[in-house]
Each structure stands twice: as C-alpha cells, then as structure tokens.
UniProtKB/Swiss-Prot annotation:
Pfam families (alphabetical): UPF0182
Family statement drawn from the similarity comment of this UniProt entry: Belongs to the UPF0182 family.
Keywords recorded for this protein, A-Z: Cell membrane, Membrane, Transmembrane, Transmembrane helix
Protein name, entry field: UPF0182 protein SCO5204
Region ranges (Disordered): 884-908, 943-1000
Principal location: membrane
PANTHER family, sorted: UPF0182 PROTEIN SLL1060
Membrane-traversing stretches: 26-48, 70-92, 121-143, 177-199, 220-237, 267-289, 296-318
HAMAP family assigned to the protein according to its UniProt record, in alphabetical order: UPF0182
Compositionally biased tracts (Acidic residues): 888-897
GO CC terms: plasma membrane
Bilayer topology term: Multi-pass membrane protein
Length: 1000
C-alpha cells in the first residue's frame, strides 16, 4: 500500500551538517579569488586608461575628469545618504510609546521584532544604496559641473530677461540638476520616513483614534513643505526656461524661445504659481505649531488647481482667442528674435544672399565657352565612386585597402593648387594570407603610402591620372613617412617594436620587414602592464607570449576620430576625417565642434539627422551617429590632427571668439594649442567642414529670410534636394569644388549645394562657402537666389532630362551592353554668366571589370544637353563653340592627351594607329546603333591598346626603366591584367576629360 505520509519514516535518515573543513576552505579560497579577479579587472581598466592617456600626453584630461567624477560622486552620494538616513533615524526616534496594541500593530510588531537586531545595518544598507545610486548619477554630470565652474560670458544678452547667454548655456543646466537632486532627496526621504513612521506606529491606517501622531505630522509636513518650496524654485527657473524651451510651431520645426502665449500667459502664470507655492510651503511649515493638516491640504489643493487653471487653461484661452485670430501680427516680434538668435547661434548671420537670374542673357557662344573654363575646375573624378579603381590599380596586396569614400584636397603643382582625390593604402586584416594571433597583431600592423590623382583629369582609358602612386608611393608629394599605423580602417590593436618583425611592404624582390621606432603606444616591458592589458583585452597571450619583449609597445584606439574623442571628450567630432601630407608626415585632419542646447531663442537641430545624406546612409563611419542629442549652437572651434605614424594628437584653437571653447580651455588648461601654432603647410590643407555646412544649409532652408512675416507665411521655404544619382531618397551631399561665384575674381576652393522649393523639384537657390582656410573670405557663405517668376531646372529635373533624351538613353543602353554597369558620378552645379552649368561624369564598370572607368561626361546648360567622351567635347557641343586656344605647359606624367606619335618604336606607332582606327569605327557604329559592329570595334580597340602598352613597356625597359606615364596610368604593380583595364565599352584613346584651367 503506498505511503500517504502519515506514518513514521521507514528509510535511513540523512544528516545534513556543516560542510567539511576542506570544502569550507575551498569555497573561501574560490570566493577570495573571484573577488580578487573582479578587483584586478577593474584595476586593469583603470590602469590601461591611465597608461593610454599618458602615452598621448593628455594625462591631465584623464585626471581632471576622474577627480571631477569622484568629487561629484562622494559629495552628492553623501548628501543623499545623509538626507535619507537622517529622516529614517528621526522617524524612528519620534516613534510613539506602544501601549494597548491593535490588530494592525500586532501584525507590525512581528516585523519590528524581526529587524530589531539588524536596525543599524539596515539603516546603513539603505543609506549606502541610495548614496551609491545618487553618486553615480551625479558623477555623470561632470560636464555640467565643469561648464558651471569655468563658464565664460558670451557678451550677448537674451532679449526677454536681459541675462547673458552664458546663464542659459552654463548656469541653468546646473541649477536644474541641483533642483532635480533636491526633489529626489525629498521624495525618497518622505517615502522612507512615512514607512518608518508606519512601522513604528507614528502613522496608522486601521487603528482607532488619530491617524498620525503629532511628531509624525510635524516631520512629514516639514518634508512636504521642502518639496513644495522646491516646486516654487522650479516655477521660478521655468520662467527662464521659456527662453530655451522647444515647442511646436508651424513656422519651423524645433522652435525655441518665447512666443506670444509664453510671454503673455505662461510667464505671468509661472510668477503667480511661484507665489502660491511659497505660501503653500509656509502653510506646511506652520503645522509644526498648529498640528493640523487642514491648511496645508487646502493650500496644496489651491496650488494644484492654480497649476491647472493658470498654468494650463489660461494659456490655452490666450492662444485660442488672442493669437490664432491674428497670429501673424502677434507672433512677428518673437519670430524676429528667433531669426536673429538662430542665425547667430549657427554662424549664418553673415550669409550673403544675392539675386541671380538663373538664365543667361549672353549671346556670345565663344565667351560662354571660355567663361565655362574660368568658372570652375570641374572635378570629374568622383571620390565616392572611384575607390574601387584605386583599389584595383593601387592596392598592390590584398592586405591593403582604400576607404569606401575617398577625400578631396588641394595640392600645389608648379605653384598652382589643383583639386586632388586622395586616399591612404591602409591595413586590411581581412585580406592577410593566414589569420592567427601573431599575424593579426604582430606581423601585419600598418598600411603604406598615399595614392592621389588629379580631380579634373583622366587618362585616355578613363582611369585616374595619378600624381602619387606605386609601392612605396612616389610622385608629386616628395619624401614623407609612408607607414600608416593609425587610420580609419585600423580598428584592432597591434604590438610593435619588439622581437617580432613586421611586414613593411612587398615588391618584386619579396617582403620587406620593419620594426616600429616611434614613441606611440604603451610600453609592454613592464609585467604589470602586460597583465593589465591581458585582462583588459581578454587575451592571456599578452602576458606570456615570447613575441613580446624589450621595446614592445601596444597600439590601440587607432582611428583618428576615437583618438580625438578620447583626448577631448567635450568636443563633437565631424564625420569625415581626411588625410594630408604635412611637413613630411601623413596627418589625419579632424574637424571638431563645440555645441550647446542652451542658446536662448535659437531653434534646435539634431546633428545625427541633419548631417545625414546619401553618403552617410551607406557608410556609418562618415556619420555623426553618436550625436542624436539636440543642439542650438555650434562652432567649428577646434582643428585636430592625428599623426598616422606616431598617433600624436594635437588640438588647435580655430574659433578664437567662441565662449564655449574658452570655457573648456579653462577646465582643461594646456590641452588646446593657440591658432598661431598652426604651420603654414598644415593651414594649406585645412578646409571648411562638411558637417557644419550641412547643419547650416538645413537651417538656411528657412532662415535665409530676414522678414518675420515671410518666415511665418512659409512662402519661401526651401529644401535640400534628394541625390538624383541615388535611389535611396537621401539628401544630396555637398561637394568640394574649385569654382568662382559671380562676385569673385578667381576660383576658390569651395563647398557647394543646391536648394529646391519645398515639395518641388525646380531650383530655388545655389549655396557655396569659401572652404580654403587662411584666406580672408574663409567661411563666407554666399547664396544665389533664383527668381520665383521663372523656372530653372533643379538637379532631379536635370537628371531626368539626361535619362529621357532619346540619343542619351540609347547611348546609355549601349554602354550597359555585355553586363556592363553604368554609374553616375556627382552632379556638379556651377554658376555661369547668369545661368547654371550642370556637369555629371558617367562611369562604366564592365562585366569583366572590377572597377569603374570614366566613359562619358553629361553637361547641361540653358536647356541644352550634351553627352560626350570628354568634358571639353561636351562643353563645345552645349555652347556650340570651342574654347580659345591656350598654350598648356607640359605636365610630366600626364597621360591625358592623344597618344604621342613621336615614338621611335614602329610597333608602338602601328598599334596606336590601329587603336585610333578601332575607336573611330566604334564611334561610327555607336552613331548608327549597330551593336554588333560596336562590339567588334571594342574588341579591336582592346587588342590594339594592349599591343601598344606591351610594346611601349618593352621599349621602356630597354631604355632603363619605366617612364612617368606608366606610373600615372597604374602599371603592372597592381597585379591586374592591363588588358582588363580597357575592356569596358567606349574606351577613348584620344581627348581630355578634364575641364577648366587644367584641360588641354
């Protein structure tokens, strides 16, 4: 019969006693080891951070932030612990004597008896917990504290309260933090005190008689009085907060500042509520003498009712019956304040807006053609498309790579600046032959060399004209340190300088090795350092590997942006760091901003959204992804450099008038160098930053107007057009371009964009900023505003026109033959003699090609469109005239003109002649739309060009080496077959694709 549990146990009893001594010792040892491991891991994080900051010579940043956080943690943690602990202790001390116990008190007595032996420990535990939480929260306010302590006046006052802007930017955030801390301390104290009073009989719920003792009533009323007093302070600060309050307003998104209803309803309401709250607080304090809740409850109810009626209903009535019937007249004075403040806060107050006809009245076609060359050095090398071309022609080894988006800079040649597309041959660990810990972190440690090409020219095959190429790199840039230990693609750590040799680069003779000799990184000779990094990187081999020895240094935090962010955590970093060769070193140049969201009356914007465009959508490294907080003041106050070899970070003051930068310089003295320390060579490569320009252009879609009524009507609202060459629907990116605005006498390196009317595609304005640092006009924004009475095609319409013209569409279809892919380059806009010139390079990536080559150039002006092999030819066709003949100086290494017939090698001459014949035959077939003949001609062209290149290479070797043309064209060092470079359709053996001053 089964056991029902009612009888005595039938089996042997199992004794559960204390663990044996050995088990207890083992458990204790494991516990101690676990605690030590956790402690050492925490120490390792702290110690490695300290070593890193010391290695980059910014240890003061580490110590300042550390001590500030520690100070805030202990001060506010202690204040919170004392406030809560004191009120718990006081509530316990004020407990009533227990006599006749009700059922409620009998139930509570069990809890009182249970915690009696642990009261002190419980009190310490509660106060420690709330203190830790409060201290951790306060330590996160270290920026707010430093800005309040070191705040520098702006020298400008808000139009409502006549207070310096620094009050809103530096003081008000700290006061609000203190207020929030006070509320938290009081609320927690009230809850803790009420629970203690209830536990010990000071408050009763079901017991007969008074619900609260006099002592409990007095204690809680004082706490509630403090709470209401803090609410009075909050009402008073809210008055000033109206100047930086965001609200919905039809005139603009993210409106900031007072409007009519704020100044005439909310502002007096806040003042009245402040007075009521003060009276209510006094009534709560009065219960110490009156011992009754009647008056405080009445006062508190009055305050709540007033908040609803005066703070909510009254402003709504003012808005409904005073503002809405006559909104334009009521809001106009406040809109004027917002216009002035926003334009000043974003640095757009000096924007020069000029009327521009949009259509040329010039009848002289020859003049138009000549002016087109003078108006801009049109960049037909799109840095956002030709990275695969750099990769194929100049990668050299699989463990090198170029960035997805190349950069545009200026380099002087023969005393003249030329727009240059530049990229670094960085390390690509994904391409190393064999992956293991030694290869990943010891042997393959750095990239090698700069590759640069002219932005305005291509060679006869549509490839870049390299001004710096090969491995090691050689060309116009001269001698410089080519090793790249710090770059945008270098995201893992490397250990260098020790017994293990590094792969430097490879050539035809084999691999070259190298050992790092710089002072970058942290020394690993110390075993404590090795143990700390082994723990920090979760890699025990760092501790015991024989590949680490005397002189070994660990390099990490190697991208330019993260290095600048680490040494200047108070700066906002631009999304695009770019390289430049400066004083014999490769320097990464990083633009950095100071921001605040406390500029009164200035509308806010979100950097992460405002700076997004068609480039950042597909390349997160270019986006300001961390900046989703809103700001309403921004300055490009710092230019930073990061040495690609040593990793040295230098911060240079750029905006010498910025009060936010002055504040941070006081907080971190010695971290930012004076503007005068910028060398002349570095100054030549500084430029106007893209992200600041994108923020400003977004604001200028509305804030280009200065009249309040026009602003309110929204009749002149613009928008940044979508990128017409991209189907993503993202905004068109701004473009760097050497060009000339109507009021300029010569071309200037500029950053440009276009605007269209809101919801429409025609052009409404063109905007350019002088981007060349060191010039008197640097940062000057010019807007050409087109008349609303005439319609000028915008970028999307021009692109549609390109695609819809029958001849162009047919040519594009032919170019797409044979599995080829057509890619449209940047659609550039250039003001020209009252009209607007559009230029768009067209690239073809053949079915058997891995990279795009320039094949055609689209040009549009005044409704006329051309689709030709070269920019010159397209301009000639659009204007119906040729440019005036100008003598071009010889440019060594240029392969942009017709293949020279001066070769003494008959094989070369014969091959070039055959190539020209094949090219002519292909063009004729293209015009006749004979695909079969066109394909045959392209095959003949490829064979002829291959024969010419092979013959020329043999001739060069016989003469003692390769010539400059081979270098610029990208020779066999790229590892690809030369014939594949010409396999794309419509290869052009003659003509120059360049334009402007560099065309020939």
């Amino acid at each position: 019969m089964p056991d029902r549990g009612g009888g005595p146990p039938t089996g042997p009893r199992i004794r559960v006693g204390r663990p044996s001594r050995r088990v207890r010792t083992l458990l204790l040892t494991l516990g101690v080891l676990a605690v030590l491991a956790m402690a050492f891991t925490m120490f390792a994080g702290f110690w490695t951070d300290w070593l890193w900051y010391r290695s980059v010579h910014y240890s003061s940043v580490f110590t300042t932030t550390l001590w500030t956080k520690i100070g805030l943690f202990f001060v506010f943690g202690l204040l919170m612990a004392l406030a809560v602990g004191f009120n718990i202790w006081l509530a316990h001390r004020l407990r009533p004597p227990l006599s006749a116990m009700s059922m409620e008190q009998q139930n509570l007595d069990r809890y009182r008896m249970g915690i009696a032996p642990y009261k002190k420990w419980l009190l310490l535990g509660i106060t420690a917990l709330v203190g830790l939480i409060a201290g951790a929260s306060a330590s996160g306010q270290w920026r707010t504290w430093l800005m309040w302590v070191n705040g520098v006046p702006f020298g400008q006052k808000d139009p409502q309260f006549k207070l310096d802007v620094s009050f809103y930017a530096f003081d008000l955030p700290w006061y609000r933090f203190l207020l929030g801390f006070g509320f938290a301390a009081v609320i927690i104290s009230v809850i803790a005190a009420a629970l203690t009073h209830y536990l010990y009989g000071g408050l009763r719920v079901t017991s007969p008689g008074a619900r609260a003792t006099a002592a409990a009533t007095g204690h809680l009323s004082v706490l509630l009085g403090v709470f209401v007093a803090l609410k009075a302070v909050a009402y008073w600060l809210d008055r000033y907060g109206l100047a930086v309050k965001s609200s919905d307003f039809k005139a603009t998104d993210n409106w900031t500042g007072l409007r009519y209803v704020d100044a005439n309803a909310y502002l007096p309401a806040k003042t009245i509520l402040f007075c009521i709250a003060v009276i209510c607080a006094l009534l709560f304090f009065a219960t110490l003498w009156r011992r009754t809740w009647q008056l405080p409850v009445i006062g508190f109810g009055l305050m709540v009712l007033s908040a609803i009626l005066i703070g909510g209903l009254y402003p709504a009535l003012v808005q409904k019956f005073q503002v809405q019937p006559n909104e334009q007249a009521k809001e106009a004075p406040y809109v004027e304040k917002n216009l002035a403040a926003t334009r000043d806060a974003y640095g757009i107050e000096g924007t020069q807006v000029a009327e521009y006809p949009g259509k040329s009245e010039t009848k002289d076609k020859t003049k138009l053609r000549d002016d087109a060359d003078a108006a801009a050095s049109v960049r037909i090398m799109d840095p956002n498309i030709i990275s695969p071309t750099f990769q194929q022609l100049q990668q050299m080894r699989n463990y090198y790579a170029f960035p997805t988006n190349l950069d545009v800079d200026r380099y002087a040649k023969d005393g003249k600046d030329q727009d240059t597309v530049i990229g670094l041959r960085e390390l690509n660990l994904a391409g190393i032959p064999k992956k293991n810990w030694i290869n990943n972190h010891f042997r393959y440690t750095h990239g090698y060399g700069v590759v640069a090409a002219k932005g305005t020219q291509v060679d006869s095959e549509g490839r870049p004209v390299f001004t710096e190429s090969n491995l090691p790199s050689e060309g116009d840039l001269g001698k410089y340190e080519q090793r790249i230990y710090y770059g945008e693609k270098t995201t893992t750590y490397s250990i260098v300088g020790g017994p293990q040799k590094e792969i430097d680069y490879s050539d035809d003779t084999g691999e070259k090795t190298f050992s790092y000799k710089g002072d970058g990184g942290v020394d690993l000779s110390n075993p404590i350092n090795r143990a700390a990094y082994a723990a920090a990187f979760s890699e025990p081999q760092i501790l015991y590997s024989g590949a680490i020895g005397d002189g070994s240094r660990i390099l990490y935090n190697r991208t330019p942006k993260e290095r600048v962010e680490a040494v200047a955590p108070w700066l906002t970093i631009d999304g695009d760091a770019y390289p430049a060769v400066v004083d014999g070193r490769i320097q990464w140049i990083v633009d950095a901003y100071t921001t605040t969201n406390g500029y009164p009356y200035a509308s806010r914007t979100t950097l992460g959204d405002t700076t997004a465009d068609s480039l950042t959508a597909n390349n997160n490294s270019r986006a300001v992804v961390a900046q989703q907080n809103q700001v309403n003041y921004i300055r490009n106050s710092v230019k930073a450099t990061v040495d690609a070899y040593s990793g040295d970070v230098k911060l240079y003051e750029w905006d010498t008038q910025d009060p936010v930068l002055k504040t941070w310089k006081k907080a971190f003295p010695g971290t930012v160098q004076d503007k005068g320390e910028i060398s002349k060579e570095l100054m030549a490569h500084l430029r106007y930053p893209q992200d600041l320009f994108k923020v400003q252009r977004e604001l200028l879609t509305r804030y280009h107007v200065k009249d309040a009524n026009t602003f309110l009507s929204g009749s002149e609202v613009w928008q940044v057009p979508d990128d017409p060459t991209n189907k993503s629907g993202d905004a068109v990116p701004p473009y760097y371009l050497s060009m000339k605005m109507p009021d300029q006498k010569a071309q200037a390196f500029s950053l440009t964009t276009t605007f269209t009317p809101n919801g429409r595609d025609n052009l409404s304005a063109f905007m350019a900023v002088d981007a060349e640092a060191g010039t008197s006009d640097y940062g000057k924004i010019r807007i050409l505003k087109l008349p609303t009475s005439t319609t000028v095609d915008g970028p999307k319409q021009v692109q549609s026109q390109f695609n819809s013209e029958q001849d162009i569409a047919e040519s594009i279809r032919l170019l797409r033959g044979g599995d080829s892919e057509v890619e449209y380059g940047n659609l550039l806009t250039v003001p020209l003699d009252g009209g607007l010139l559009y230029v768009e390079p067209v690239y073809v990536r053949g079915g058997d090609l891995k990279y795009p080559l320039l094949r055609k150039v689209l040009v549009s002006y005044g409704g006329n469109t051309a689709f030709e092999n070269t920019l010159d030819a397209a301009l000639n066709k659009v204007f119906g005239a040729q440019a005036a003949e100008t003598e071009q100086p010889p440019d060594e290494g240029d392969d942009t003109t017709e293949p020279p017939p001066t070769s003494t090698n008959p094989t070369v001459r014969e091959a070039l002649s055959d190539a020209q014949k094949a090219f002519d035959a292909g063009q004729k077939a293209l015009e006749q739309k004979d695909l079969a003949a066109y394909a045959e001609a392209q095959k003949d062209l490829e064979e002829a060009l291959q024969r010419a290149e092979d013959a020329q290479a043999k001739a060069d070797q016989g003469a003692g080496g390769k010539n400059g043309d081979d270098k610029n064209a990208g020779d066999k060092n790229s590892g690809d077959k030369a014939g594949s470079d010409k396999a794309g359709p419509d290869a052009t053996p003659t003509g120059d694709a360049g334009g402007g001053a560099d065309t020939g």
